[in-house]
Amino acid sequence: MKSDYNKLIFEISKEGRKAYSLPKCDVEEVNLESLIPKEFLSDKELDLPEVSEVDVIRHYTQLSNKNYGVDTGFYPLGSCTMKYNPKLNEDMAVLPGFANIHPYQPEETVQGALELMYKLDKMLAEVAGMERMTLQPAAGAHGELVGLMVIKAYHKKRGDLKRTKIIIPDSAHGTNPASAAVAGFDVVEIKSNPDGSVNIDSLKSALSDEIAGLMLTNPSTLGLFETNIKQIADLVHDAGGLLYYDGANMNAIMGVTRPGDMGFDVIHYNIHKTFSTPHGGGGPGSGPVGVRKDLVEFLPSPVIEKKGEEYVLDYDRPYSIGKIKSFYGHFGILVRAYTYILSYGPALREVSEKAVLNANYMMHKLKEKYYLPIEQVCKHEFVLGGLNEDILGVSTLDIAKRLLDYGYHPPTIYFPLIVNEAMMIEPTETESVETLDQFIDALNKIADEAKETPELLKNAPHHTHVRRIDEAKAARNLIVKWEREQ
């Protein structure tokens, strides 16, 4: 028999049950139609579940026990930086002076919030080697869009309207070409070298007076540093373009080097990656965008400025791309990031150094049984290409599904696309060597199982709440809304 707690809450609803009690009404009751015209009232009952309080508590507690996150276990999702989120950050975000304010309040009544955002702007700019930031973008892809809009505004002010193309390597994040298209650019894809680095000859052949810029991640999606970055920056700038930094992998280089020093002109951060704010489940995230000095005038309005001892919202920006989000960004997330940066200070460099150390440790321990396509020192993450031995029918997907039986969230699989059977692993700096060893041991045991009992992997997972689903059918026939049977 199906447990009530494996059902939707609508399925355990029983007419007449309720999870609340109200005091006896002490005012005269009136008919709703006497207050609101009938044409504005729905003629349908609200189809809400009728459940008791204990049913509500048990239902959602059971659901929470089925979840997996950084608070419950190791989460090595490559290109996502699933680091632990310190609870001090949460404490600061719910302080009454931050949690109980409203963006419609007069500036003089929210000086603390404006001061925090102004200082965070300066901190993030310093880490990236930029002049100023905007904190408005909601997340990474939104930040990409804003950065590309800044690039477009720059060329427009110069009267260089023929620059309608953005160069993007084939190893780039999938959001890069999507963001470029939404910003109104045509995408020019160039081939990467086998190690994921930019192919200089391909770049040279793509550059022209129609190129607005190049979008690049450094370290690359394969977790390797772009050693030719100075040459790349010079080539793009000599051709009249701008260099855009996708900050997805900033966790590898904080305090070690800065995108601005490499020659990048525009950058976005993923606050929810690098600066330890919660992510997953749809947000909220945060994707601040930074620019070099001559691009500041194009940043979204308003920009927070300090005049004397007062912080103000500056809307007088004739060349601004305009407002790109309601109000001023995801403020609660910004409080968490500000707390994180204050907590670490100069030790942000150690964050990146340990992230790199952890990744290299794992890579070294796993390369005996898993194929390592590029054998060199990595940065914060690395990419494996399936098992070292070609075991008929055992795929990276099978390995990932079997990891679920060992109690782990799998790494990113089949990305980047330039590596066959790719597994992208990013341990982050917050994990101990004991945790890393346990995960390494699980992966190595799975490699042994693949040789001895391959069917165990092909039919995995065996012990999860949901077994292997038909992913093709799920993609083609997506049902995300419950409807009552007629």
Swiss-Prot record:
GO terms for biological process: glycine decarboxylation via glycine cleavage system. Its cofactor is pyridoxal 5'-phosphate. GO terms for cellular component: cytosol; glycine cleavage complex. InterPro entries: GcvPB, GDC-P_C, GDC-P_N, GDC_P, PyrdxlP-dep_Trfase, PyrdxlP-dep_Trfase_major, PyrdxlP-dep_Trfase_small. Its EC number is 1.4.4.2. It catalyses: N(6)-[(R)-lipoyl]-L-lysyl-[glycine-cleavage complex H protein] + glycine + H(+) = N(6)-[(R)-S(8)-aminomethyldihydrolipoyl]-L-lysyl-[glycine-cleavage complex H protein] + CO2. Keywords: Oxidoreductase, Pyridoxal phosphate. The modification N6-(pyridoxal phosphate)lysine is found at residue 273. The glycine cleavage system catalyzes the degradation of glycine. The P protein binds the alpha-amino group of glycine through its pyridoxal phosphate cofactor; CO(2) is released and the remaining methylamine moiety is then transferred to the lipoamide cofactor of the H protein. This is Probable glycine dehydrogenase (decarboxylating) subunit 2. The lineage of its organism: Bacteria, Bacillati, Bacillota, Clostridia, Peptostreptococcales.
